[in-house]
Amino acid sequence: ALLRRHRAAGSARLVWRDVLGLDADSDAWRVVHSEGDGLSGLVVDRYADLVVVEFFSAGMFRHREWIYDALRAHFPGCRVHAFADEHVQKQESFDFRGTEPQAPAIITEHGVKFRADPAGAHKTGFFADQRDNRQWLSRHVQGKRVLDLCCNTGGFGVYAAVRGASEVTGVDIDQDVLDIARGNAKLNDVRVRFVQADIFPWLRDAAANGDAYDVVVLDPAKMTRDREQVIPALKKYLDMNKLALGAVRPGGLFATFSCTGLVREDQFLDMLRRAGYYAGRTLQVLKVAGAGADHPFLANVPESRYLKAVFCRVE
């Protein structure tokens, strides 16, 4: 009976994604979003002809062959890549080395091209959850000097360059994702300066040099999975945001994000208020958002609304 319910839920979610009309904007979107879609322990992302499956539970892993068959039926001719993080396998007591590696896919999002490579980037290969936020921010960058902090594979920075920013700099500590980011800039025939650095000393140096930007993006990786570590995570967010605010010119735009599900939106906004106070800056909040409609969350599971996005004007 449980398997029948899972199969019915899975089929319903695939149909619902069609109703959302996601293909009009992008060929990269989330097909199944774990408990938000009633399929806890399963995440599926579609990147053009490549479908990436991530298992978070032994139960979903046991049904993997049915899951693969259902995806191939819905996306004829697709390639399937599946994996599970080591910590999940240890926690859930199953062993999975993953399917055969697949070549990266080239996806298009609002006219901007990216390489989605599950073997060479964090998570399933591309952060489709930021699609709407990238598009919104890119409407405000023409002729502007843009700084993309914790840039990963260059999503916000490449968008900004495509949309006419005068200068774009991306900073990340991970050289592997920066190599993908440079490839993404090349795919779109735009110039972005990517720097491999820890953002803390980099921002302190920028402040010492009086270096300021019209638009600053701060999108760090998840801080913690442990409820006991939420307060230390908020302290790190505070330190990061305080430094990043110092790089925004007066009247500039600041976009800050948290993908730590255990950090609530009210906690994140309070952290941002304190960061503004300590940085001596006034923050005018323009927009508070999250992930796109292909990343639904359940009202009774608030931590499943993991992505917080805040866009501010800074004085």
Please state what every model-predicted region is.
Residues 239, 253-315:
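C-terminal catalytic and target-recognition region of SAM-dependent MTase-like enzymes
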Residues 167-172:
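Conserved SAM-binding motif I beta-strand of class I
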Residues 1-48:
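Non-catalytic accessory regions of SAM-dependent methyltransferases
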Residues 32-45, 61-127, 135:
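Non-catalytic substrate-recognition/targeting regions of SAM-dependent transferases
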Residues 153-166:
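Conserved SAM-binding loop of SAM-dependent methyltransferases across substrates and taxa
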Residues 176-214:
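S-adenosyl-L-methionine
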Residues 143-150:
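Conserved class I S-adenosyl-L-methionine
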Residues 177, 213-243:
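Mobile active-site "lid"/loop adjacent to the S-adenosyl-L-methionine
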